[in-house]
Structure formats: C-alpha cells, structure tokens
Amino acid sequence: MASSEVFTSEEAAQRAIKTYYESQESRMGYELVFGGTQHFGYYTPGTWSPFPIDKSLRRMEEKLMGWLALPAGSRILEAGCGVGHVALYLAKHGMRVTGVDIIDHHVEQARRSAQKANLPKDQIVIEKMDFERLEAIPSASHDGAFTMQSLGHAFSAEKALAGFFRVLKPGGRFALVEVERRPNAEADKKNPRLTEQLSMINVGTGMPTNERSHDGFYKGLLEEAGFVDIESRDISDNILPVVRMFYVVLLVPYLFVRLLGIEKHFVSMLAGTAGYVGYDRWRFMVVTGRKP
C-alpha cells in the first residue's frame, strides 16, 4: 500500500505523527516503560524476562555504535531524535551528534538533557527539523547518519534517504533500525482483523513508510539511494522479551477497550497486543551501508 493510500497528504501524515507523540497515552507509556526512550531494547536470543529494561536500551545503543562502525569524534546525524537519549549516549561515548525532530516537546526535552550533561558545546546539537527536509544541513558535512525506529514515519522514505546520502561525506556510514512489514496474503485471509489492526496502528502513529514496507524494502531503499556495502540483519529475536511483555501487561485493558469499540483511540495499547499476536507479520531489521 502506497503512502498516499494511507494518508492523503504529507501534511496529514505529520498531523498524525504529532497527534500520536503529543497524546497522553504515548507520553506516559514511553515514560513509564522506557524512561522516555523511544526504541526497543536489545536482548540475547532466548531471554525470557525483559528486566532490567534500562540496561537493554543502553545495549541497543551500544550495538548501534557497532553497526555505524565510526571512530570517536565523528559527526553523526540522528534523524528523529525524540527526547535525545540515543544522541546523548553517542555523545557521551565520544561522538559529535546532530539530532533533528519535528515534535516541539521532544526538541525542548532533548536540549535540556544535553545542557544537563555538561558536554562540550558542539558535542550535541538539537534542531527542530523535518528529516525529509535537510536543506539547512550542508552537503558532505557528516561522517554518519542513522534512524532508530523513526524512518517508518517518513511520508517519502526515498526523499529521506536521498537527504541522508547528501549530507554524508564520501565513505560516510548509514544505519537504520526499523520495523519492516511482512505481507502475507494467506495469513490475511485467515485473520483479516489482525491485518486491519496492523494498518490501524500505522495510521494512528503516523507511519506511512512502515505501512508500505515489505521483505527487503529497506535494503532496496539504500541501494536506490546509492549506498554500497549494504548489510541486513534480522534482530527480531533480540527484542522479543519486551514485545511479549507488552502483550501480557496490556491484553486485559485492551480487551476492555475493544469491547467499548474505542481501540483506535488507544493505538499504543493496540500496538502492544497486535504486535505480539502478529509477530510473524513483521520483523525488526538493521540495515547498514556506506556512501562511496
């Protein structure tokens, strides 16, 4: 399904994104479960318990540094930086980070956190900016760039990738850590309601790119943008403990919300349950590449 079939315009997509991240359900959920961080944690396959969650989050950020494979002092762009937790982790480990986001309270909180960290002035810079419109960032100005569960919000992922490619220096590294859909016509026939729920999640969270993704989608984006040395990793098993936890915790309240017919107004709750039930309908991918 193309982005235009989910959202009538880029403006509509951005309204959905802002509505989601400004909702109390979203803000309280991220704060209570992840301490404000907006990405999954990384676990050893076979792990059952998701606790302690904060250690798994930092482990994912450590893994990201490995996937970027850049030396200390590198200038890195984070597209969709949220409240700045990933940017801060990288900055505290010697990277110089430019974080961009379109949500006002994200930008404000990220800037406050950066100030409290007492890092050198240019170690971390947070800007309010749409990562599909990076014209204010000079070409060939960054050694690396990445998205951490944010590229799914793009109205045009192709436009976003072209921008990332432009701002990277020759030899610059790019990494994305994203949910990739796995369309299955047979599964859709067996459980059409689940298919509808998964699309409802993408609409409610403002994720047109996630809705149109499919097996190999992100790898294809990097190839089309001009990246080389592309590698793909499926790390779905590494996030399973927290996906399972969401299902266990949210199932009963979700059933109540569903009974009332108001599930579209509780999209985070829907994502926490349908995401686990439909675990075979998506995978969690890391795709990396280099600008030649």
Curated annotation (Swiss-Prot):
CDD domains: AdoMet_MTases. It is found in: Membrane. The chain crosses the membrane at residues 240-262. It is a single-pass membrane protein. Its EC number is 2.1.-.-. Its main location: membrane. Its cofactor is S-adenosyl-L-methionine. It catalyses: 3-[(2E,4E,8S,10E,12Z)-4,8-dimethyltetradeca-2,4,10,12-tetraenoyl]-4-hydroxy-5-(4-hydroxyphenyl)-1,2-dihydropyridin-2-one = 8-epi-ilicicolin H. It comes from the Eukaryota. It is an enzyme of class 2 (transferase). GO terms for biological process: ergosterol biosynthetic process; ilicicolin H biosynthetic process. Keywords: Membrane, Transferase, Transmembrane, Transmembrane helix. The keyword Translocase does not apply. InterPro entries: Erg6_SMT_methyltransf, Methyltransf_11, SAM-dependent_MTases_sf. One of its GO terms (molecular function) is cyclase activity. Gene3D superfamilies: Vaccinia Virus protein VP39. One of its GO terms (cellular component) is endoplasmic reticulum. S-adenosyl-l-methionine-dependent Diels-Alderase; part of the gene cluster that mediates the biosynthesis of ilicicolin H, a 4-hydroxy-2-pyridonealkaloid that has potent and broad antifungal activities by inhibiting the mitochondrial respiration chain. IccD catalyzes the Diels-Alder reaction that converts the acyclic 2-pyridone intermediate to 8-epi-ilicicolin H. The biosynthesis of ilicicolin H starts with formation of the tetramic acid by the hybrid PKS-NRPS synthetase iccA with the partnering trans-enoyl reductase iccB since iccA lacks a designated enoylreductase (ER) domain. Belongs to the class I-like SAM-binding methyltransferase superfamily. Erg6/SMT family. This is S-adenosyl-L-methionine-dependent Diels-Alderase iccD. It comes from Talaromyces variabilis (Penicillium variabile). The gene is iccD.
